[in-house]
């Protein structure tokens, strides 16, 4: 069993391992899930992202993790924290959080449950001073969720990314400080 990093009431968040790419390709790489994330990816692209995440954990002690549903043992998504590594972003090196939930598990509170745990982990265990999250204005569900987490819109961090559909530009960012989180903390699945 890969290393468990975080455990919540319904989820296990564990480190990504090489064999996870095929599972993510099959279950998370759908047109609906990937619509505002640059579209469906090739398996080699997912493998490259997984390799990056494994190296982040080895080098910095954090990265993205697979979300495993305790009741079924099934993959329901992935989430975590990484460094902003898009060279077009004005804040390269900041700590960025992100999430992805399988389409048939939407609206069950898994994003909220996992990200509340990830944010606690980032501030309390890793010791980051603040977090950012990146999305597009078109991805209203994503930025509304960022607001629900207590994050604030940061127009000064917007940037254009030609790798994405023009409808998904500019990339927009939200941020959350440790102090904000202390007053905004999640209360559980919603």
Which residues fall in each region the model found?
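Acyl-donor (CoA/ACP) binding surface of acyl/acetyltransferases
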Residues: 1-36, 68-190
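Short coil/turn segments at beta-strand junctions that form active-site/ligand-binding loops
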Residues: 61-63, 129
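Short loop/turn motifs at secondary-structure junctions and domain boundaries
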Residues: 56-60
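Conserved GNAT-fold acetyl-CoA-binding loop/helix
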Residues: 32-52, 63-65
């Amino acid at each position: 069993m890969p290393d468990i990093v975080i455990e919540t009431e319904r989820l296990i968040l564990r480190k990504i391992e090489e064999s996870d790419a095929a599972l993510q390709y099959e279950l998370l790489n759908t047109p609906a899930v990937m619509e505002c994330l640059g579209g469906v990816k090739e398996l080699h692209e997912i493998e490259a992202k997984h390799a990056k995440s494994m190296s982040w954990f080895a080098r910095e002690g954090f990265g993205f993790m697979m979300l495993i549903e305790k009741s079924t043992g099934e993959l329901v998504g992935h989430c975590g924290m990484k460094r902003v590594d898009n060279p077009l972003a004005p804040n390269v090196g900041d700590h960025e959080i992100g999430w992805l939930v399988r389409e048939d598990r939407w609206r069950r509170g898994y994003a909220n449950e996992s990200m509340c745990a990830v944010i606690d982990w980032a501030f309390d265990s890793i010791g980051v001073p603040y977090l950012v999250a990146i999305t597009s204005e078109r991805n209203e569900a994503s930025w509304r969720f960022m607001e629900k987490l207590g994050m604030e819109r940061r127009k000064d961090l917007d940037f254009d990314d030609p790798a994405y559909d023009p409808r998904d530009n500019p990339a927009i960012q939200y941020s959350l400080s440790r102090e904000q989180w202390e007053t905004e903390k999640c209360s559980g699945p919603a």
